[in-house]
Structure formats: C-alpha cells, structure tokens
C-alpha cells in the first residue's frame, strides 16, 4: 500500500500540486487521471522520488520515503518497478540485457538464473524470440512490453506506469492495460498508472484519483464514475463520445 | 558562477552511492574502447598530416644558409610534442568524443533512460559519467603519445621524400638538445585536458532539457565550452609548469 499525505510541489511561482492526499491499494490498479498539464506525471515523480515534494510525505507500506535516509530510499527503490512513457529502454543494450539490467545491478544471482528469470518475464508479457533484438528494431507496443518485463523482473512490490498507452493503437493499448492488470493481480503488486485514456479508466480503473489544476477533486472506482456529480470531472470523462453514449444508456 | 557551482556539485555527485568495482571495471573498459580505440585512426591521420605540414612550412621559412637543416626537425619535435599533439588533438577529441558524450547523455535524459536508472536506485551520474571520465583520463594520454609519434613520422617522411632534409639530419635534429621534461609536460596537459573535456561534455549532456533540438544544442555547447576550457588551462599550465 502506498499513502501520500498533503503533497505539494511548485516550480518557481507555478503551483503544480496543491495538498494532495490519497491511498493506493495493494493488489489493485490505482489510476491517477486528469487532463494534460494537471500534474499527474509530477505527482508520480514525487511518489517514486524523482522529484522532491515541497511539502508532504509518501509512505510505502508505512515507511516514510520522503524523509528516509539514503539507505532506506535505496531499499524501497529496489522494490519499485516503473514503466516509462516511451519505454525508456537502454539504446545500447538488447532486449535481454535491458530486462536483465535490474538483476545485474541489484542482485548477485548467477547468470543462468538471471536468464531463466528474463525469459519468464518476456514470456509473461507475450514476447518470444526477441531477446537479441535492439530497442530500435522493435515496435512501440513491444517496447512497452519489454519495459513491463524490466519493471517486474526483480519481483517489485510497487509498479508505476506513466501513460502506458501513449503512442499505441487502441488494440495494443487494451493488451497493455490488460497485461498491467493481470500482473498486478497475479503478483499482488501495488500498481499506480498515470493516464488520460478513458478506455484505460473504464477497463482497469479499480481505484481512481482525479486531478484538476493540481488538486485532487475526486476519488472512486470505475463503477461510480457515472454519478460523480462534479462538473470538472464530468467534463473530463464525458468529452469522449463513447462515454457520453454509455451515460445516456445508463440513464 | 551558478553554472560553475552546479558543475562542481555534479563532480561531487560522481563519488556518492557508487556501484560495485566490477560494474565500473566493465563500463570503463567499454568506454576505453569507445573513446580510445575508436579515436586512434582519426588521431593518427590528423597528427601525421600536422607533422608533415609543420615540416614543409618550417623548411619553407628557413631560407638562411646559416641555419642548419636539422633545425627543421628540432622545430617539428618541439611543436608536435609541446603543442600540436596535446592541444590540437584535444580540440579534435572534444569535437569527436565530447560531442558524442553530450549527445548520448542528452538523449538518455530526454528519453527518460536516466530517470529509469534513478528509479532503480542507481546513482546515474556515477554510473554513467564516472567511467567516461576515468576512461578519458586513461586513454587520452595514450592518444597524445600516438599523435606525437605519428606527427614525427609524418614530418620525417615528408621532409625526406621532398628533399627538405636528409634522414640523418632529421634524426639528428630530433635528438639534438632534447629535454625529456617536454614529455612529462605534454602528458600532464593531456590528463588535465581529458578530464576537462569528458567532465564538461558529460555535464552539458546530463542536464539537457527538452527534445532533439536541445540535444544538438548541448552537444555544441559541450564542444565550445570544452575547447575554451582546454585553451585556458593550456595557458595556465604553460605558465605554471614551464
């Protein structure tokens, strides 16, 4: 479980996050949603420690990550897997080396065990016979899968995904979403996904946190998304025609 | 001054939260091949022609019959070892290796590869930059030695083939009044230049923000700043050590 307490972050005079609190539950896909520029990615970066919040704390299973010393931060980070927007695969390494990288750095596993683990993770994300390919030789969707394989290779307790569907076709997006949800349930991980894709929200949104202009305006699940009673939230959700049709049918 | 302070802090961050020695050993070897071995042919070619041109021009300007011909190779020796090999090759090194370092790190920054390392709990400056600086400091003096040898060979071949100087005169000139301290000075300079080029280029690349355009700007800034730093340090080292 991850808990965020009163997180605020500004860049110069511009307030990006304003007093945001919330909880991300274990074994569920927790979504941070909102329009572009509302601070979703900044919040994610504050949670994983890529940015230091101006105020507030982040707790990973009751461990205060924000105020932790370097050793504890390092310990928590070893339990984190992250899928970046563009995959963030290392250009100079092939697929196998990319997935193996966290094991090389963070463990003392023998090579054959590492290879077994890498092959298991690649198979788990539906990739076979791509071990020796370079990132430039595979498609965007495959890069995302390799990114997921790398994120889960070290058995993380926490999985973070920054806009996992960006740049993907709708069909591949659904495959990636399903994969994230399956992995979350299968390995009982606390997963946090940043997205503004309503298909993802309706597909895998087990716990949803809605940001609007740097503030948390709404929290709920995909089941009570239709009756939030909040104009800003409805404006975001029902911009999509399919969502409007869905609401009309529900009414 | 703010930029300089940031640079000093960047250098300080290279030595905290380091990985295992084996990790650095492997990365440094890879960088040595990338930086040193792959630059050797260019350095050899450039220095060969620098030596050749220096010989031709020195011979052209020595018109007095009172000056012995072996002075040509003496001048070539001093120019090559003192300035051409360490300093001019440093400018070429900044253009080839420095821009490549800045471009590589800049691309890693904008594609979130550096963030990926940080999320894994790896000190990205130490992991990515320290091997580059160590490899540079190890390999650049070797490149300078190669440049010195190739420069003198170029001078010898062109000088003797054009008849500007006989082989015996050229070798005599090379050995005449030779001061071994010149080599110490050239190698000291090369270590300082290697450190400056690799650290400044890495610094510029590491802090790239934006997109592909900014990566190009970082690469250009890396080369220009490195070359200015090299030339300034060249002057101060000459004042200090000669």
Segments the model singles out, each with a brief description of its role:
Chain A
Residues 48:
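Helix-to-loop junction immediately C-terminal to a conserved catalytic motif
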Residues 134-138, 142:
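Conserved ABC ATPase signature
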Residues 170-172:
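Helix N-cap at the start of a conserved alpha-helix in ABC-type nucleotide-binding domains
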